[in-house]
UniProtKB/Swiss-Prot annotation:
GO biological process, one term: cellular response to oxidative stress
Record's protein name: Protein Turandot Z
UniProt source species: Drosophila simulans
A Pfam family per the record: Turandot
Lineage: Eukaryota, Metazoa, Ecdysozoa, Arthropoda, Hexapoda
Primary site of residence: secreted
Similarity comment text for this entry: Belongs to the Turandot family.
GO CC annotations, alphabetized: extracellular space
Signal peptide positions on this chain: 1-23
Annotated localization: Secreted
Keywords associated with the record: Immunity, Innate immunity, Secreted, Signal
Protein role: A humoral factor that may play a role in stress tolerance.
Amino acid sequence: MYFAIRLSFVLAVLFCLTGNGSARMLDADRNRLQQLQIRSQQSADANTQVDIAYEVIGIYDKYKGQGGSNVLREAQLNSQVNDFKRKTMVIDGVPAQGGVWGILGAIKKAADAVPDNVKKDAENLVKSSTKVLVRGIYDYLMGKMKQH
């Protein structure tokens, strides 16, 4: 009987610690998402935008497919994420299929041949598309995290 009571107590403590740990993780992820969203809105650098997007995607990957998920919205976000990753994938410092980095790299290599307004337009495209992706994931996850 004594053993059963002690075991129950230990299990109850472990249950509380586990539940509290996931709540802390949820709060940490929520806070990090808010920080990244603010940085995304304030940053004017294309490389920083891409770095922020990858970090937001990492957080999204932790929570997608869990209970209470909106399957249709996640399918849309997954499509956007996969498209983004395909366009920005870098392997050993070299763009996999060109994509965003190919555009920016080509612009940097041919800087003399490409007008400044074209370079600026390409960078603005990277920044705006990345901000849209970050905002979409942010809105979805913040809504989902409020449910918990």
